[in-house]
């Protein structure tokens, strides 16, 4: 049970401290108060970003606005987590040489005064109240006043007392001392020989063994100077820059990821429709990759921007390699479908047939289907002097038809777009899907039905030839946010332009004539290298239609998610208050094993209808069109609660949907904020402010996945439900940054991008190196979707060279090499693919036997660390730490079926151990564990 009682207030002490603060503010230089200048599987979210050899200077203005400066934890790096105060005004200049400078006393006072002001935010603003405002403020800042090692240190209880006054305007000295002592007891004492870190700016992390020092230069963890002592110890090894190929190109490693998806389809141990589903995923992944990543490469090449990337390759070289590898893989996919999966489906009674294989009765019935269902929605478009070559929409399936006029003898070209409103695979009449077994289902591609009725569309013309083709267009959005008076309107305008992006790929059937192929290449203004030739049918992503049919015996066995016991006890027939459950115990959710609908969705729903709830704040990156989350926020606003939604309308391929329900939220009275200029808001956060008998209490959810009920059934994600005051204060601060002006911020339990996440991780990696060199327990275990950030990768290389064991679980893009002599012998990388898309992010550090574990939304990519608002939360409750430690241990143990990265950069699938015993499927293990928890 988390203590939340209201606390008495030492009024006289508060008055004296307020007077002291006012005196400092009155004499301070006004400039000290100025802000710094500045105004999966299909989840891969293919955001085009700068070449990996460039820095994030293009978004410096946005980062200056988000003046968080979270370079570490509010507590010690050893025992705490969080983010720091921003650098001084000359930080930007000094950062060029890897240094920042502590602010002046007046600036520090201004910062603290700003914190005091923020601490008095109203209940509706979610800053807290009687209990959570005063009590939590005292506790929070008492901890901040304690030294980094967990002892009273330089500031002690008195400092904690003063700081708590600044934050909340009231405190009790004894309570501050007690809380500081409590925190000291939770953090391990610094051992002899502990590494002395680098002093931070006011309000930021101080590493073990460091006392506060005034006006000292701080070394940026991203700089080489920060790692100088480690590099000196590794002088006998070749310098890192002697390994020019230590970074794998991000585009090429993505191709490797999609190859692993294809290998899932090759697995004959899987149900046949599941194999077809993986073929579908492979195709849809490649579509998005070309729409964004390849389109971006082509655009840079056309503009002459082809610098050498971190991988040592330039854009032209990368594009050539992508093209050759993608064509090989699509050829392998087509062969797998034609020679393996398609026959296996037929054997299971699910046949994909063609027109020539039908009997006359079946043809007659399909002709009637064509006349009444298909013909009315077709629009043939001819090309002649009065009809220019038509616009071909991206990812549409089309028929290219060559016609001859029997009177003139002239040939003509026409195009027919197959409508998206009709099924791609038509069930043959008489052989439809029924409950009868064995199955006798026959499906015919829609293009076959249309092709054999072209005489209905072109009466009086001779049909010379017809071929199916498909184009992929550039789907990047280009919105100048700094110049856009209304971001929503600018996005809507750009979405209208996106459909006319340049063609980047043409897919054709292998039966196409050279003439038609060349004609399309010229009209689409592409090259022959952009043409992909495959046997029919094209666009195997539509196999998902067949997978979605009600044929359970040929798919993964259905799993029903469970409700965590803490939320809905077995003894109760009625759903209990989720707030009561959270007060008793922090709840760690693991979706889809734990049901999203009865946990996160229920949390928001109860908040919307609970009369004691005053305010709800939530970030929304992706959600479904009929989202119960959105409906709950609307209902809350209509019931008079203050509701704030931070909506990211730039979420890749969900822009239109997000705009629609953002307007719906606004109409209902929800305060809709579109994030920060230049930054995508990618963190997954919810904050609920509730009036309780002992005052206000704030309830939080921090997750790794989107608030999307549908994808939550297929994505593996983690989430934390808590009313911990440190987390609540951090979320309050972050929401205030996102919705208003709160540039001076510090965090206790969060690491927040773009300011502090990378540096917070770098500091922890260095701490593990130092601990290992001092003979203490040290290891690093990280699970992410992608890793390409060069500074993080180099830090992990340094850890490996120092002897620290590094285990990585990377589902997708992986720019690191492992097992390379002198570079990465101690780095081990696995990749897990299965029925659920592995989407959670876990960062775990040994911390000298006191594991420090974070979960959150951020991957180790430039966009996540530099151009997005991301948040990781430190898990502190011992049983939850133990559970996460067990999970990442399992996934890195070698006991499960997974892909392993080899020193030559290839991936090897391992399904059996050295004795030939079949390895466990980690997702099956977790499904069994979830069921066991609620029995």
Task: Locate each region found by the language model.
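N-terminal localization/anchoring segments of enzymes in phospholipid and broader phosphate metabolism
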Residues: 2-4, 10-13, 31, 93-97, ...
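D/E-rich low-complexity acidic segments and tails
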Residues: 4-86, 107-154, 164, 173-191, ...
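Arginine-glycine-rich low-complexity intrinsically disordered regions
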Residues: 88-107, 157
């Amino acid at each position: 049970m988390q203590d939340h009682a209201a606390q008495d207030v030492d009024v006289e002490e508060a008055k004296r401290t307020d007077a002291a603060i006012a005196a400092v503010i009155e004499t301070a230089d006004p400039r000290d108060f100025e802000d710094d200048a500045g105004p999966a599987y299909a989840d891969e979210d293919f955001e085009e970003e700068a070449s990996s050899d460039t820095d994030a200077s293009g978004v410096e203005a946005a980062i200056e606005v988000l003046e968080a400066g979270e370079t570490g934890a509010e507590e010690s790096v050893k025992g705490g987590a969080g983010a720091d105060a921003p650098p001084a005004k000359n930080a930007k200049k000094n950062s060029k040489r890897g240094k920042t400078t502590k602010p002046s006393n007046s600036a520090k006072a201004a910062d603290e005064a700003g914190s005091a002001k923020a601490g008095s935010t109203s209940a509706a603003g979610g800053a807290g109240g009687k209990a959570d405002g005063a009590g939590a403020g005292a506790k929070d800042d008492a901890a901040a006043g304690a030294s980094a090692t967990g002892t009273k240190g330089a500031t002690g209880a008195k400092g904690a007392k003063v700081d708590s006054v600044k934050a909340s305007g009231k405190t009790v000295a004894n309570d501050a001392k007690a809380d500081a002592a409590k925190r000291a007891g939770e953090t391990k004492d610094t051992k002899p020989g502990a590494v002395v870190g680098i002093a931070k700016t006011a309000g930021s992390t101080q590493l073990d063994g460091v006392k506060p020092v005034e006006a000292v230069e701080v070394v940026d963890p991203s700089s080489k100077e920060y790692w100088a002592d480690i590099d000196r110890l590794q002088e006998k090894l070749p310098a890192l820059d002697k390994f020019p190929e230590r970074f794998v190109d991000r585009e090429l490693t993505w191709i490797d990821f999609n190859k692993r998806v294809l290998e899932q389809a090759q697995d004959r141990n899987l149900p046949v429709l599941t194999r077809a589903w993986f073929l579908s995923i492979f195709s849809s992944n490649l579509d998005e990759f070309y729409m964004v990543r390849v389109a971006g490469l082509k655009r840079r090449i056309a503009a002459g921007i082809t610098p050498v990337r971190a991988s040592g390759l330039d854009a032209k070289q990368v594009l050539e390699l992508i093209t050759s590898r993608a064509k090989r893989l699509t050829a392998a996919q087509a062969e797998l479908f034609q020679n393996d999966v398609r026959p296996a489906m037929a054997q299971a009674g699910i046949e994909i047939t063609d027109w020539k294989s039908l009997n006359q009765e079946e043809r007659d019935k399909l002709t009637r289907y064509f006349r009444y269902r298909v013909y009315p929605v077709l629009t043939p478009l001819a090309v002649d002097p009065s009809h220019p070559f038509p616009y071909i929409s991206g990812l549409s399936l089309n028929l290219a038809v060559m016609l001859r006029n029997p009177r003139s003898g002239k040939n003509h070209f026409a195009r027919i777009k197959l409508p998206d409103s009709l099924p791609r695979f038509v069930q043959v009449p008489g052989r439809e899907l029924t409950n009868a077994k064995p199955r006798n289902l026959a499906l015919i591609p829609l293009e076959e039905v249309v092709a054999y009725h072209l005489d209905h569309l072109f009466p009086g013309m001779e049909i010379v030839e017809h071929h199916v083709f498909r184009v992929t267009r550039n789907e990047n959005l280009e919105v100048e946010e700094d110049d856009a008076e209304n971001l929503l309107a600018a996005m809507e305008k750009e979405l209208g332009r996106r459909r006319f992006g340049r063609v980047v790929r043409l897919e054709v059937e292998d039966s196409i004539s050279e003439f038609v192929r060349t004609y399309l290449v010229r009209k689409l203004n592409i090259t022959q290298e952009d043409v992909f030739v495959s046997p029919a049918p094209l666009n195997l992503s539509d196999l998902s239609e067949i997978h979605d049919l009600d044929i359970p015996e040929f798919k993964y066995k259905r799993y029903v998610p469970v409700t965590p016991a803490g939320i809905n006890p077995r003894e109760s027939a009625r759903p209990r208050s989720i707030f009561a459950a959270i007060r008793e115990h922090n709840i760690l959710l693991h979706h889809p094993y734990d049901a999203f609908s009865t946990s996160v969705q229920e949390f928001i729903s109860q908040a919307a209808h609970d009369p004691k709830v005053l305010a709800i704040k939530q970030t929304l990156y992706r959600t479904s069109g009929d989202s119960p989350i959105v409906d709950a926020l609307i209902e809350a606003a209509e019931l008079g609660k203050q509701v704030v939604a931070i909506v990211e309308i730039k979420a890749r391929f969900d822009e239109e949907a997000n705009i629609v329900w953002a307007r719906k939220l606004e109409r209902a009275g929800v305060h809709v904020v579109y994030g920060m200029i230049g930054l995508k808001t990618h963190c997954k956060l919810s904050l609920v402010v509730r009036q309780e008998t002992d005052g206000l209490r704030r309830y939080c959810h921090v997750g790794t996945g989107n608030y999307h009920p549908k994808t939550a059934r297929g994505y593996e994600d983690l989430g934390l439900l808590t009313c911990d005051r440190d987390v609540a204060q951090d979320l309050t601060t972050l929401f205030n940054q996102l919705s208003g002006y709160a540039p001076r911020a510090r965090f206790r339990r969060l690491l927040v991008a773009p300011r502090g996440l990378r540096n917070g991780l770098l500091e922890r990696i260095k701490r593990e190196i130092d601990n290992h060199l001092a003979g203490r327990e040290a290891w690093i275990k990280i699970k992410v979707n992608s890793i390409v950030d060069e500074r993080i990768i180099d830090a992990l290389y340094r850890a490996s060279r120092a002897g620290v064991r590094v285990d990585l679980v990377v589902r997708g893009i992986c720019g690191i090499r492992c097992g390379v002599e002198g570079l990465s012998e101690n780095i081990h990388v696995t990749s897990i693919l299965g029925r659920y898309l592995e989407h959670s992010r876990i960062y775990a550090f040994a911390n000298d036997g006191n594991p420090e574990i974070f979960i959150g939304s951020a991957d180790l990519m430039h966009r996540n660390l530099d151009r997005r608002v991301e948040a990781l939360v430190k898990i502190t409750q011992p049983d939850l730490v133990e559970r996460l430690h067990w999970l990442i241990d399992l996934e890195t143990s070698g006991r499960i079926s997974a892909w392993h990265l080899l020193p030559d950069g290839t991936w090897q699938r391992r399904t059996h151990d050295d004795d030939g015993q079949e390895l466990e499927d980690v997702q099956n293990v977790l499904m069994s564990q979830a069921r066991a928890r609620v029995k």
